[in-house]
Swiss-Prot record:
Keyword Cytoplasm: no
Protein family per UniProt: Belongs to the MSDIN fungal toxin family.
Cross-link (Cyclopeptide (Leu-Pro)): 11-20
Record's function text: Probable toxin that belongs to the MSDIN-like toxin family responsible for a large number of food poisoning cases and deaths.
Protein name in the entry: MSDIN-like toxin proprotein 4
Record flagged with keyword Protein transport: no
PTM entry text: Processed by the macrocyclase-peptidase enzyme POPB to yield a toxic cyclic decapeptide. POPB first removes 10 residues from the N-terminus. Conformational trapping of the remaining peptide forces the enzyme to release this intermediate rather than proceed to macrocyclization. The enzyme rebinds the remaining peptide in a different conformation and catalyzes macrocyclization of the N-terminal 10 residues.
Keywords of the record: Toxin
Amino acid sequence: MSDINTARLPLFLPPVRMPPCVGDDIEMVLTRGE
């Protein structure tokens, strides 16, 4: 995961409250979007 995605992930959902499946989905969307 790139630094940009790492910085943007917390803006979508707090990592502590983010289920793994949701985290993977967001990461996939961001990676595909970039």
